Amino acid sequence: MEKLQDQYSFLCSENIRKTNPLILNILQKLDEEIEKRPKEKITVNIAGNSRLDSGQRITSEDFWLLSKALRNHPCIGGVDVRYNLIGDVGAYYAAKLLQKQPNITYLNLMFNDIGPEGGELIAKALQKNKTLKYLRMTGNKIENTGGMLFAAMLQMNSSLEKLDLGDCDLGLQSVIAFSTVLTQNKAIKGINLNRPILYGEQEESTVHIGHMSKQNHVLVELHMCKHGMKNYGIQQLCNALHSNSTLRYLDVSCNKITRDGMVFLADVLKSNSTLEVLDLSFNRIENAGAKYLSETLTSHNRSLKALSVVSNKIEGEGLVALSQSMNTNLVLSNIYIWGNKFDEDTCVAYSNLIESGRLKPENTDVEPYVVDEHIYLSEVSNGLKRHYYWTPTYGECYVPSSSAGFALVPVGERL
């Protein structure tokens, strides 16, 4: 098999184009990896936000030649070109790559200036694709038009397991379309529909996703950040969770849920035995909401493993109640509380949990320290999805403590 760097150099000279030193360097390293492990699948990683490469970004022309070099190589299992400038033209070549390269199971195109036209090309390519397991389109403004085409694609595609369309400017129509399609699709295990462009206060998107969750018995991971969800919306989701036995990771962060919504959530946690990760970050559940959760976690629930209540206007009383529930509930291993109002009792309670070994330092986002014989808590870089937007390209790339949600509930080929 011809080396990737040689193939790329030949294509550049054949098409009278200059070789990109960044691509050439990465392909050289990949060739070395392939020589060491010829039977393993390799991911081509050319992230445009890598601090090691001085912010160089590849263009659609670069991606055209790169994709041609990758087409016939059996060792290529994934392509990650996040934070580059491939645009709609590059999306055309990505679609061609999906048609020509049968070994790719992971494709990351997040934040690449791909619009509705590029989204259409990729969605149509996936209608016939039978190998891709995980696609990230995060941050590409495919809008409602592109969203509708991806929803239509899911009616035909039976191999894609995880789809991330967060920050894609989806409209209400496409969110409803996904909800409808997912009542029938038996392959999708994880979906991200974060930050759609919604108008009105009727929470229609949440109502439809709630109906879908009642009928879908495959979905494991659901992200619904920034849906403008209020207590009525969380009530609809909770009604669905009473009869859902597959969902393990629910992300409803950055919404408008208050203490009243926690009544419904605490109630469903009494009977639901599958939900393992719950992200309530950046809502407003306050002390009362935290107490509802702590009571359920103390007396009933023994399935939840990770809870994030970051920035929820919770004060000492509610935070201490949650810490006390961990003394009784030995299944709950991860808790994230930064951004709330810590008093001395809170600092002492979480310090005791950490020092006793009940709460491992890597499983929380706070760390105790002492000044003048008083205990305080500082923030540490742990969380459910700290590396959702940015993953380090130096040192240890995958740190479970920074992406604990995905570590506890792994879905898709690459995370």
Swiss-Prot record:
GO biological process: one example: cell differentiation
Gene3D superfamilies noted in UniProt: Ribonuclease Inhibitor (3.80.10.10)
SMART domains recorded: LRR_RI
Pfam families: LRR_6
Keywords: Cytoplasm, Differentiation, Leucine-rich repeat, Nucleus, Repeat
Gene Ontology cellular component annotations, sorted alphabetically: cytoplasm; nucleolus
Compartments reported by the entry: Nucleus; Nucleus, Nucleolus; Cytoplasm
LRR repeat extents: 246-272, 274-296
Function: Highly expressed in stem cells where it may be involved in regulation of pluripotency. In embryonic stem cells (ESCs), important for normal expression of the pluripotency regulators POU5F1/OCT4 and KLF4. Also important for expression of the ectodermal marker gene NES and the endodermal marker gene GATA4. Promotes stem cell proliferation in vitro.
Subunit structure: Interacts with NPM1 and NCL.
PANTHER family found in the cross-reference section: LEUCINE-RICH REPEAT-CONTAINING PROTEIN 34
Name of the featured protein: Leucine-rich repeat-containing protein 34
Lineage of source species: Eukaryota, Metazoa, Chordata, Craniata, Vertebrata
Gene designation: Lrrc34
